[in-house]
Amino acid sequence: VVEDTPYTVEDIRQRFGNDVAGLVNVVTKQKKEIYQTTKQVDNYQQILASLHYDIRAVMVKISDRLHNMRTLQSMRPDKQMKIAGETDCFYAPLANRLGLFEVKSDLENLSFKYRCELEYGDIERWLQQDEADNRERLQRFCKNVKGTLKDHGIQCNVETFWRRPYSIWRRMKQQDVD
């Protein structure tokens, strides 16, 4: 990591290229801003390094984190916050970069549940209250779309998805909605 050497990120970029410099920069920022203990930094560096040798090791680590997040309720609140923060900052983005979009979404939602308990609860209640009505309307809409396209000789498959609490919260924040 660059703070432990006389080299800068730019030196690394010139010698090894943008990809390596970008990785070094990310690890350096994480070390400075997020992970305070050497043990944590070493652990995350080992995870990133294992990407080069065997992706299965990273998959096991991400799976383990997902399991830990699903059973986090048994831990003290301070540990919940710490683990949820690590998950949000490291594991969810890593899962996303590896194309594990459903896992990323699960990690984000579980992290959100512990980091923003009130907001998560409000959104979850709102989703459950309107779920039956929304499902019925969405099914009618999809049926109409498929019928109209079929009438015009177009075969299609219409799929739907439900936004999850973290995604809704993030969108609300982006649009400055309470």
Name the predicted role of every residue range.
Residues 1-177:
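Active-site helical microenvironments for divalent-metal-assisted chemistry
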